[in-house]
Amino acid sequence: KELYGRELTRSECRNAEEALLILAEKRPGLTSANGKRICNRCGNQDRKKMLAAPCACGTTCFYCLSCLNMGKIKSCTVLHHLPEINAFERPIEPILQWQGQLSSEQQRASEEIVETVQAEETRLIWAVAGAGKTEMIFEGIAACLRKGGRVCLASPRVDVCLELAPRIKQAFPAVPMALLYGGNEDGYSYTPLVIATTHQLLRFREAFDLLIIDEIDSFPYH
């Protein structure tokens, strides 16, 4: 299950079964289009962030500087991907166990968020700090999970992810959840609910039915 909804190099597929690696979709780490090299992990097309160097494969390979801190993506790198199949057990009701109370305006926003989730559309939630944005998304998350969907809450900042994790876990105690950020020693687990830094999203591909990005105006996401 390590590969479902993800795109990884061979060295990152430590726990994947060999049979699944054979079945996985494969594409090169770097490709060329219209005279430009493109990193298929981070999307970088800046020539200044592509360098060439002798490689262990026996040739000179270009590699991407833009996502180098997540491991080197080279011309000879092969990325492995299996489509997301949402192989999760349906959570037992009540999925959402938050006991708080929304104000009338918060409730209206929450209902509109649920409508957006059900219609599979995009919505911007814009409010001052402390307005209860996190609590307003709870019903939207629950609506997606009830349909067997996969949900990710992402932020450019590790501290925000660490602050969100216990609040989300308390609201959805019966739903398996993974927390992903650089340096986290817990590693990856295949779960219906994910909290991750935006950098970690580069290892996913078409994985989530609902993606919520917090602090969207923060560096480095914006």
What are these regions (language model features)?
Residues R27-F88:
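Interdomain "pre-motor" coupling segment immediately N-terminal to P-loop NTPase/helicase cores
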Residues T198-H222:
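SF2 helicase catalytic motif II
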Residues W98-E121:
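N-terminal pre-P-loop "Q-motif" helix
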